[in-house]
């Protein structure tokens, strides 16, 4: 990206590339100073700032991308670690539990002050405590306590993962245009008047109060407002567990923990654990998870098809600004200008630091903005009319207009209403044929840019000469009421021996 100082001067926004490199700068020393300053700043930081920095660091990590590389191996490790601990507890600690807890069944003679007075008795008790068997059993006792701590930690970890999977990922959607709400558990009614109020502060107490007391109260209060549908909206709480939590839940499932915790674990139990892990992964990840992905792909394909077949053909029509010469001189000049509207092309207008207006267009092939030159730019200039241009040199400018009007009179239906019939004085109801240039085209019909719209020509309201009106009525024996005024006009300019059909008909009637 670049910063436009003027139309001709632009500066790159990334100023790091413009800085000169220092040959005496040691990158290793700079990194050491940076780490030292960070380490020193930890002692001057408030604990609340530590919490904010830690949460920001956790939230900025893309956990979904680490679901296969981190979540799945970690969950499987927890599951098999739980299996190994339970196997050692039942096969190693439980058979020797009586030997491990032997000191708790009688008095500890080593702590007796009376026995210490007798050296031979004290020596006997000291040798017994230092025997190999006693050391082994003491080691098993400490190992059993370590196994108990591991079982408690793994159980709490599994409970936390289960809670985050089932109740820790919800998104609320407000449905304002849904008239009849579905009968679902996670869909509730709410008033539009309380839309900006925070009813739930998100605390544990408010959640418990909602589940124990608030559910029935809200359902009863919303049922009374079924008639007034204009003041309510629906809230949908969608369950959206992340891919990382889902993979961690599947690989370290609570069903496996409960199964290993309440059954006799042996070496054959490993087969059941492996089958359980495979079935759960196949069911949730491979089948149901891929089904959701496939449905989203199908929905995206349907939207793309609707956009390609329905939206784009109607919203992105290929139009172009046109300037048409509508003067009576019949020059037939047509200028095609590029469309400068934002809904037709990727065109943006910005201002430089000096206040100059810059028009840029986005080039999808290069992914860059390019300047668009709009001053004096025309395309496809047509200067010759596509029909008999030579006739325009001998006839008046309205010859084609009058012939086209009278040619359409024979095919024009009779208008029963009081609407004005299309005549040459109302040419707006007659459109030229496609692909032909006609002076009937209005000067405002071909352009959408106001700055390109020319003034209306004063010659458009000029009447044709009386001598050329003979071509308007080339049929004989017509009883149209319009013939009488035409005859009067012609009698002023033509001789009595005219051989027109009008004069012959009048001569026969006089005779």
From Swiss-Prot:
Q: Name one GO cellular component term.
A: nuclear membrane
GO biological process: what's one of them?
A: maintenance of rDNA
Which residues are listed as membrane-spanning?
A: 146-166, 255-275
Q: Where is the major localization of this protein?
A: nucleus
The answer to keyword Magnesium applying to this record is no
Origin, by domain of life?
Answer: Eukaryota
List UniProt keywords, sorted A-Z.
Membrane, Nucleus, Transmembrane, Transmembrane helix
Q: How does it sit in the membrane?
A: Multi-pass membrane protein
Disordered: annotated span? 420-511
Q: State where composition is biased (Polar residues).
A: 439-448
Report the subcellular localization.
Nucleus membrane
Pfam families (alphabetical): DUF2418
Q: Which family does it belong to?
A: Belongs to the NUR1 family.
PANTHER family, from UniProt? Answer: NUCLEAR RIM PROTEIN 1 (PTHR28293:SF1)
**What job does the chain carry out?**
Member of a perinuclear network that controls recombination at multiple loci to maintain genome stability. Required for rDNA repeat stability.
> Mind telling me what this protein is named?
Nuclear rim protein 1
Its source organism is: Zygosaccharomyces rouxii (strain ATCC 2623 / CBS 732 / NBRC 1130 / NCYC 568 / NRRL Y-229)
Print the organism lineage: Eukaryota, Fungi, Dikarya, Ascomycota, Saccharomycotina
């Amino acid at each position: 990206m670049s910063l436009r100082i003027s139309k001709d001067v632009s500066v790159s926004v990334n100023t790091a590339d413009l800085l000169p490199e220092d040959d005496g700068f040691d990158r290793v020393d700079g990194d050491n100073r940076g780490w030292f300053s960070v380490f020193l700043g930890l002692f001057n930081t408030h604990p609340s700032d530590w919490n904010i920095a830690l949460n920001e660091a956790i939230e900025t990590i893309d956990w979904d991308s680490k679901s296969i590389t981190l979540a799945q191996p970690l969950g499987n490790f927890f599951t098999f670690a739980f299996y190994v601990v339970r196997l050692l507890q039942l096969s190693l600690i439980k058979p020797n539990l009586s030997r491990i807890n032997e000191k708790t069944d009688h008095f500890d003679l080593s702590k007796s002050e009376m026995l210490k007075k007798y050296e031979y008795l004290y020596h006997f008790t000291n040798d017994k405590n230092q025997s190999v068997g006693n050391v082994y059993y003491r080691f098993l006792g400490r190992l059993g306590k370590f196994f108990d701590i591991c079982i408690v930690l793994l159980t709490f970890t599994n409970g936390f993962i289960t809670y985050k999977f089932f109740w820790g990922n919800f998104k609320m959607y407000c449905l304002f245009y849904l008239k009849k709400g579905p009968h679902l558990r996670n869909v509730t009614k709410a008033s539009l008047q309380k839309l900006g109020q925070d009813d739930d502060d998100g605390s544990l107490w408010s959640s418990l109060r909602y589940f124990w007391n608030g559910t029935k109260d809200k359902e009863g209060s919303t049922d009374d407002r079924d008639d007034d549908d204009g003041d309510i909206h629906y809230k949908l709480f969608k369950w959206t567990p992340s891919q990382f939590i889902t993979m961690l839940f599947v690989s370290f499932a609570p069903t496996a923990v409960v199964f290993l915790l309440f059954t006799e674990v042996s070496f054959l139990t490993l087969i059941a654990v492996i089958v359980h892990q495979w079935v759960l992964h196949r069911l949730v990840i491979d089948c149901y998870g891929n089904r959701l992905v496939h449905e989203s792909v199908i929905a995206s394909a349907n939207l793309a098809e609707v956009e390609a077949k329905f939206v784009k053909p109607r919203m992105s029509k290929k139009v172009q600004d046109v300037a048409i010469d509508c003067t009576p001189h019949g020059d037939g000049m047509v200028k095609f200008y590029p469309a400068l509207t934002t809904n037709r092309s990727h065109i943006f207008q910005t201002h430089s630091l000096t206040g100059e207006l810059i028009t840029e267009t986005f080039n999808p092939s290069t992914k860059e903005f390019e300047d668009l030159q709009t001053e004096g730019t025309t395309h496809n200039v047509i200067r010759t009319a596509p029909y008999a241009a030579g006739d325009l040199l001998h006839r008046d400018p309205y010859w084609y207009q009058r012939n086209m009007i009278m040619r359409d009179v024979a095919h024009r239906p009779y208008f029963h209403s009081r609407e004005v019939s299309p005549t040459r004085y109302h040419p707006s109801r007659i459109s030229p044929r496609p692909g032909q240039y006609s002076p009937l085209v209005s000067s405002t019909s071909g352009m959408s840019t106001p700055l390109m719209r020319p003034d209306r020509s004063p010659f458009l309201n000029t009447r044709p000469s009386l001598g050329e009106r003979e071509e308007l009525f080339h049929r004989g024996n017509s009883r149209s009421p319009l013939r009488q005024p035409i005859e009067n006009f012609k009698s002023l300019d033509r001789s009595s021996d005219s051989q027109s059909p009008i004069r012959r008909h009048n001569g026969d009637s006089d005779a």
